[in-house]
Each structure stands twice: as C-alpha cells, then as structure tokens.
Amino acid sequence: MGEITRALISVSDKRGVVEFARRLQDFGVEILSTGGTAKALMADGVAVQEVGDYTGFPELLEGRLKTLHPKIHGGLLAKRDDSSHTRQMAEYGIPAIDLLCVNLYPFAETIASADCTLEEAMENIDIGGPTMLRAAAKNWEGVTVLVDPDDYAAVLQEMEQSYGGVGASTRFRLATKVFAHTARYDGAIANYLSSLGPDGNRTTFPQTLSLQFKKAQDLRYGENPHQAAAFYRDGSGGGLADAHQLQGKELSYNNIGDGDAAVALVMEFAEPACCVVKHGNPCGVAVGPDLLGAYQRAWAGDPISAFGGIVACNRPLDAQTAELISDQFIEMVLAPAILPDARPILAKRKNLRVLAFDDGRAWRRTGWDYKRVRGGLLVQNFDQAMEAETDWKVVSERAPTVQEARDLAFVWRVGKYVRSNAIVYGREGQTVGIGAGQMSRVDAARCGVAKALELGFDLHGAALASDAFFPFRDGIDAAAAAGVKAIIQPGGSIRDEEVIASANEHGIAMVFTGVRHFRHG
C-alpha cells in the first residue's frame, strides 16, 4: 500500500482542488504547490509550501520555469525499493513526492476559439505539467498521480479505508489514465500546428492526424459472430455513446450502427417523427401531428422489412405508442425520453433494448467522419447539408403544388439516410416505397415501385427523391409509369436536358437541389 506523506498540486482546472487538498492535509500530508494553485489553496486556509521555496530556486521566465528541478523530478522518479536511488536521494537532499495532482494548460479550449493566434496557442502549451505527469506515471509503483478532478473522491475514499495509502491497482489505473491524457494533449498540439498553412491560417485537415477514443464497452461480437468488437467513445459528447440504456439485452455492434442512423434520421425533422431501420437503411419513415400516428405510418411503410428492426422517435415515448411497439417484434427503441406510464409497458418485453438519448437539436454531428481502408483512413466532414425550398430550382414546365412541395421536402430528408443508389417514394409525410443500395439508379427506382405495389400503396400523385442525378431518362419513365407526379434530385448529369424532357412529357414537376447526398455505409 503506497502511503502518502508529501503531495504536489498544480492545476489549471481548480474544481474540487481546495477540498481535496484540505482532506490530504487531514491525513497529515505535506502539500507543495505552484503559482495560482498555491494562492487558491492558501486563500482557503490550506497550509502550502511554494515549489520555489521547496527547491530553493525561484520561478523564472514569467512562470515558464517552475517545476523542472531535480528536487521535484527526483522525488517523483526515484524507486522507493532501490537502495542506490534512496542513497542518492539522501545524498542530494531529495525527499520523495508520493502524490502528484496536475492538470494541464487548456490548449484544446484555447484553439477552439476562431480568433486564436499562434502566439496564444503556444503560450498554452504546458511543459512542466506533462513532464511531471509522465515522471509520476512511469513510477506508478511509488507515486499516486491524478490528472482528473473526478478521481479525487475515489483516492480519498481509498486513503480513508487504507490508513492514508493508495493500492497498487488504483495507482496503475491512474498512471494509465495519465499517459492517455498526455497522448491526447500532444496529439491536439500536433493536429493544430500541422493544420497551419503558410499564411498562418488553419486548413481544414492537418498534415498529421492524432485521434483518441476511450472504450465504452466490449461487445459480444461484431457485425458477424466470428468478429470480435468493442464500442469506443470520442469524448465529444452526445450520440449513442451518451445514451442511457433503460432495459434489455446488451447492445450489439449492429444495434449501435442502426441506432445511430435511425436517430440521426428522425432528428432531421421538426415535427413528431418515427422511423424503422434495418441493416443501416430505413424501412419506413413518417411524420405526423403526434408520435402514435407517426409510428403507425412508419411501421406501415414496410412492415415486412421492419420485423426485428430498430425504432427511433424524436419525441418522448408515450404509453400509447409504447403499447403498439411492445406488440411488434422490435430489437431496440430509442427516444429522447421514456415517459413514466410507458416504462412498465415496455418492461413486459424484458429483452427489448430501450434507450433514452440526449435531445435538444444537439444530435447534429460535429467534427469529422472516418472510414478505415487498408493502409489508411478516409476523412471528411459529416453531411450536415439540407437544402431548403428556397434553394430549389424548378427545371420542369410545371412547378410543384404546395402539397407536392411538402412531399418533396419530406422524401428529400429521408433520402439522405438511404444507402446509394437511393430512391424514396412518399406522400403526405410517409414513405411508401424505398429502393436502396442498388448499383443502377433505374433499378433503385424499380425496386421502390415494386415494394410500394407489394404493400398495396398507390403511387399516383406520389413524390420521389433521388440522392444523386439521373444519368438517363429511364428512371423518370419508370417512376412516371407508377404514377409519380413530383421529383426532387440534385441535377448535374450531362443528360439533364433529356431527363427534364421526360419529366415534361409525363407532366411531372421536377426540382434540382444542386447538392448530392451519396451514402455508402
């Protein structure tokens, strides 16, 4: 058990540090500190020895040089059970430092400001802090090292239970956390500096890219049972990584992927919306004046494919909707909240996974999207674009009616979340046929028609969305034969005139958005 007699505390994040230091003092721990931390502790009555007084060497260079001294680093690095180390410590008057509590200058927060200058960024690169942290973490067998205020309580509790000591397993865990922290810190610095162009302005993508993820949980298996898998969080907050599982079996790899796609889709809509997702694709999507109606129509969009799917809603789940969900075979349901009267209804299906996710409009993704390929990593911005009706260009002789425009806006939002080549048919806030993942656009158009007819939907007067341009008129002809009267697509084909002519021949209103929404999974 590592007994603690001397601690060095130097933090930029002062949450809880005064109470932590006061409790250490109650254990008889001698406390060393620096600069602003020392002032904060002394102002609250904690007895502190300034590092400069301890080393006999003052702070220099406007505080840049404070702790880089043999009396500090020797006290952190010396092995307590090595006689040559203890002999040298005695010879040079270097007492052991048993606990180090340090967090670093706020570099990431500083560069997050759009008007951050290079000088400001460089001044917020911590030198002494990482050096001490690495020294203490390397010598974890003799030193307890803390970099996170959230760990103060656990260390104090262990000291209470162990007469002022901290166990080896805790020291090792905290040391591991330190190396992850300093790696992330140095990675942020490298990312920032390598993103600066010759003019000093930041480019979108840095020359070197350092990423860090923390394991949220092991998964039973991956996409298939023979694949091992785990789920990692990136620390940005939000998304399924921060959702609360209220009941049901453990999440699977496929649950997480489908759940992410499902929630992202429904959060595109301001009105109550529900969707059912299977294998990364929406089976049915609907909006309505209330959640129950939206769910009923989403399920009806393709009840065959929806069997065993993932349901997401963008409103708190009520009892009526929960009753309907519990009568159908669903793997998982996600909503911003589960209302109290809905909980016992869902609980009857003990294996049903139920998750509450953070709402706001905060689901919109920030940062970058990654795709691993052999030998490298593809990086892009998330597709956050969604073109408003004011951005549309009517290219047909006939403009869409008010209702057709509503239908076009609806299917266009859905189409963004369907695997390419994607065609979505819909009317009055409900999908009635989806052609997903086809190698040709005309096949996607025909698949959507076939699905609609199989389910008994009448496509006369329906709207169609295509995630990319029509390379030939055949897709328009197929949709027209089914009765479609309004089409929304990006445009941009060398045969746009031929495609527009087809729309005009069939009396179809066609609009171009100018933006493509490929989705390749």
Curated annotation (Swiss-Prot):
Keywords linked to the UniProt accession: Hydrolase, Multifunctional enzyme, Purine biosynthesis, Transferase
CDD domains from the UniProt entry: IMPCH (cd01421)
Superkingdom: Bacteria
Domain MGS-like: 1-147
Catalytic activity: (6R)-10-formyltetrahydrofolate + 5-amino-1-(5-phospho-beta-D-ribosyl)imidazole-4-carboxamide = 5-formamido-1-(5-phospho-D-ribosyl)imidazole-4-carboxamide + (6S)-5,6,7,8-tetrahydrofolate; IMP + H2O = 5-formamido-1-(5-phospho-D-ribosyl)imidazole-4-carboxamide
Pathway listed: Purine metabolism; IMP biosynthesis via de novo pathway; 5-formamido-1-(5-phospho-D-ribosyl)imidazole-4-carboxamide from 5-amino-1-(5-phospho-D-ribosyl)imidazole-4-carboxamide (10-formyl THF route): step 1/1; Purine metabolism; IMP biosynthesis via de novo pathway; IMP from 5-formamido-1-(5-phospho-D-ribosyl)imidazole-4-carboxamide: step 1/1
Protein's GO biological process: 'de novo' IMP biosynthetic process
E.C. number: 2.1.2.3, 3.5.4.10
One of the Pfam families matching this protein, by short name: AICARFT_IMPCHas
GO CC annotations on file: cytosol
Gene Ontology molecular function, alphabetical: IMP cyclohydrolase activity; phosphoribosylaminoimidazolecarboxamide formyltransferase activity
Free-text domain note: The IMP cyclohydrolase activity resides in the N-terminal region.
HAMAP family (UniProt xref): PurH
Family designation: Belongs to the PurH family.
Annotated protein name in UniProt: Bifunctional purine biosynthesis protein PurH
Native organism: Acidithiobacillus ferrooxidans (strain ATCC 53993 / BNL-5-31)
